[in-house]
Amino acid sequence: MGFFKKKEKKAEFDVFRLYGLHHPEPGKCDEITTRGYSISMSVDKARRVIDQIRGRSYAETLMILELMPYRACYPIFKLIYSAAANASHNKQFNKANLIISKAEVNKGITLKKVKPRARGRSYMIKRPTCHITIVLRDITHFDSYDKFLESLTPKKLIALLGLMSTGRRRELLCGRFRENHKIKSFLYKIALFKRYEVM
């Protein structure tokens, strides 16, 4: 029955797991979510605005929404402003350290009305709605995170990327995050980097 024999647990000191205790995974305590339900707007019109702000900082997002000439900007602006106020009041986050880690638009119910026409006929009016979800994330702990990554050898860094959740890996390897935290140069030197970037 050696095939079903359990593997012995290694008693080695796992520095990656220890470091992960101080920096929680997505959805634990460094995120705040705001949802807007049944906003009277089509999904496509809201999504073209949402795609422009995903992954950006809070201040940059507000500036973009104020200057874009679309009607969808106002309800999205209100949602993000409300999410930042909740993060500042409820969790004592600094607004300067918030980024839009997740922004999505889903189709809502379609309101139907009847428009009377000539000769007793009627036409159907369809008013589409959408549900918008905004997730703000505090990146304060990432100030020391890039220094920790720079101290690792390429082999250990690749092992760390393998232990990360998919959400944290995408956030670490996205272009805007690399530019903001100046960790672009040493990540490009690592073998298998492209393998993780496309995931």
UniProtKB/Swiss-Prot annotation:
InterPro entries: Ribosomal_uL22, Ribosomal_uL22_bac/chlpt-type, Ribosomal_uL22_bac/org-type, Ribosomal_uL22_CS, Ribosomal_uL22_sf. Gene3D superfamilies: Ribosomal protein L22/L17. GO terms for molecular function: rRNA binding; structural constituent of ribosome. Keywords: Chloroplast, Plastid, Ribonucleoprotein, Ribosomal protein, RNA-binding, rRNA-binding. One of its GO terms (biological process) is translation. PROSITE patterns: RIBOSOMAL_L22. It is found in: Plastid, Chloroplast. It comes from the Eukaryota. Component of the chloroplast large ribosomal subunit (LSU). Mature 70S chloroplast ribosomes of higher plants consist of a small (30S) and a large (50S) subunit. The 30S small subunit contains 1 molecule of ribosomal RNA (16S rRNA) and 24 different proteins. The 50S large subunit contains 3 rRNA molecules (23S, 5S and 4.5S rRNA) and 33 different proteins. uL22c binds 5S rRNA in vitro; the central segment of the protein (approximately amino acids 30 to 124) but not the last 28 amino acids are required for this binding. HAMAP family: Ribosomal_uL22_B (MF_01331_B). This is Large ribosomal subunit protein uL22c. It comes from Spinacia oleracea. The gene is rpl22.
